[in-house]
Amino acid sequence: QERARGITIFSKQAILTLPAQPDAEETALTLLDTPGHVDFSAEAERALQVLDYAVLVISGTDGVQAHTETLWKLLARYRVPTFIFVNKMDLPGADAAVRLRELRGRFGDGCVEFTTAPDPEARALCSEPLMEEVLADGQPKHDTQLMAIARRQVFPCFYGAALRLDGLDGLLH
């Protein structure tokens, strides 16, 4: 029944290779797709313990659910740096500004929108090194942002529609 509804019931993995960029070498990623449904929480929690980074997928129409908050707490417990992808933004009722307010209200001001033009002020409020760079140069340095993400001070938020491959480029780069 879960499979018929498209619910992941076991963790699955895929190996992805991102091509080299002018400023980065080719990158190999191991993607673990874990169950998002509350009935399979134990399976998801086992996978969280081995992650270097996580992408927490949230519905653009439904927003943060109770189980999403449980996953968020587990990601914090295991200190997993987390990116947020708000999916289904192509559907009626999906509103990026509403979702960002909700994310900040539930998960903190470290949730910063990364899809459109950068907001240096929002990023600066997440860590002292980011603040210093924004005050000095108007923009935080890339490496400083990466460090803030790794330390779970910044949680980059991306918006798109995964089935249409919309919004994924920014997330992957």
Segments from the language model and where they lie:
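P-loop NTPase catalytic nucleotide-binding module
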Residues: 60-173
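Conserved P-loop/Walker A NTP-binding site and adjacent catalytic elements of P-loop NTPases
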Residues: 1-62, 66, 71
